């Protein structure tokens, strides 16, 4: 319950700051949104790297049979194999777009572009690792 309330408070404060930064592009709320974007960028880069390494480790060591007691398996399942409801995906897309628009409107263009590229890259990494773990090879162009 405590984790849920903390997550709810963070999401509400982010939504409020996003709304304020879209209404007032030169306000302090933009700094909060920029700090959020930089933090999210770092998290996506680290999670993507750790996830890819753990996926390769799990596939090399265990193959397709995933023992639940391994730390690498827990990392892989929490990052890549948990189903994401469509409402959460839609909300995440709205947050990414609103963050991008807010940062561009305030003049943080480089930060906005890096945030957008890294978040899309993390989604691609997640999809490719999920396909590898399910036994399908990603599309090869």
From Swiss-Prot:
The keyword Acyltransferase does not apply. It comes from the Viruses. One of its GO terms (biological process) is killing of cells of another organism. It is found in: Host cell inner membrane. It is a multi-pass membrane protein. Keywords: Cytolysis, Host cell inner membrane, Host cell lysis by virus, Host cell membrane, Host membrane, Membrane, Transmembrane, Transmembrane helix, Viral release from host cell. InterPro entries: LysA-like (IPR047759). The chain crosses the membrane at residues 4-24, 32-52, 94-114. One of its GO terms (cellular component) is membrane. Involved in lysis inhibition. Interacts with and inhibits the holin thereby delaying the host cell lysis timing. Interacts with holin; this interaction this interaction blocks the holin homomultimerization and delays the host cell lysis. This is Putative antiholin. It comes from Escherichia phage P2 (Bacteriophage P2). The lineage of its organism: Viruses, Duplodnaviria, Heunggongvirae, Uroviricota, Caudoviricetes.
